[in-house]
Amino acid sequence: IYLVLALAVKKKTNARGATEINELVDVADFFNAHIRSELLCENATTSHPVVRADCLKLLTVFRGFVPRDAELQMLPHLAKLLLDSSNVVHSYAANCIEKMMTCRDYSQLQQQQQQLQQQNSTIAASAPVKFAPNDFAPFANDILQNCFNGFELQDSSENEFIAKLIAKTLRYIGGGGSNASGGGKLLANEVIFACCEKLCKRLDEAANNPRNPTYNHFLFEATTACVQCVDFSPNSQEKQRVESALFPTFLGILARDNAEFTPYVFQILALMLESAAVPAAGTGGVAVGISLTEQYLQLLPALLAPHTWDRQANIPALVRLLDAYLKAAPVQIAQLGYLTGVLGVFQKLISSKAHDHQGFYILNAFAKSLDLSVWSEHLPTIWQVLFQRLQSGKTPKFCRGFVVFLSVLVAKRGAEAAVSSMATVQAGIHEMILS
């Protein structure tokens, strides 16, 4: 196996495996003659784990050159290897399946390049995608079930390769991120709900004692894919089931103030709100307001508390979440008296050269989502803060943010409203700004 790996590979990348091979080595024939039988689970009692792991490594490296049908025939056996007692074998199996999902057919590309060279053509060719999500759909349930069972195997309670495969399967086959894969939704809702509940259990365990950042990251990637797999329209039962599974886990993480996990939680909460308040036809891309449930409302006081924003790593995720709140339910937030707290966050961010652009995100959300009559009383204070910063600490980044905010305000609320509000600070100041 090592001899073939050494002789056959001419070009290789970590992301794609072998992209060009030695024509004198018949990789497909070697796979069928020596590798395929080792990977069949019927040989589990006779095959040595080290040999099986090396066979999985070879298949992973040459996945772009092994015949497509041969790889598809191996999928159910690879899924069974996720339950192999050897940590190395089931980790290699998870990595192999994950890499195959986005594999490209480099054998076809190499043939095309040879033909182009013979024709003295300079046309660049690209490798076609080898598999479609439909090819993996019949095995998706087994893959996901065996992945979660694989966490119970020895030394694999936090196996990052298994966690990555779960996330990839939900995105690629389940439709969580179907824009990238072009696959659409090929998993039943009950499968997605079961995955969501199991992921919450894994997150609860990991939050008590975070040890493996890569494993934790892919758990949250998989959780995000679950959210993207289901219908999150306001009255959807799918939305309610996912929220009922996620909120206890998220609230527990926030209550423990887990520094590693809180940015992930804020981002997923923002995604949930953004998915529920999608732009409707005829609104010019403006999200349709929804009524926030008690689960979301009880988070707002903590989000607006000053100490929440003291941790630098939280700020990008918090800004996205606050922006999602303002776009999803601007009227409700204003009626509940939270605008003053939101403006307090804006003032904190705008005073920092590192985070002033985040403050402008919040201002732009104000201008886009809230009627001017709702927050016009706060505009003089906002202008004072901005003008003071322009005078004392102007930077190119701040100036760009200021111009964008002013443009959004004029486009949404009219030039007259913008000029008159600036005049409350100083008459004619808009002329000085423009000049």
Which positions does each model-derived feature cover?
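Karyopherin-beta/Importin-beta family HEAT-repeat alpha-solenoid scaffold
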Residues: I1-S435
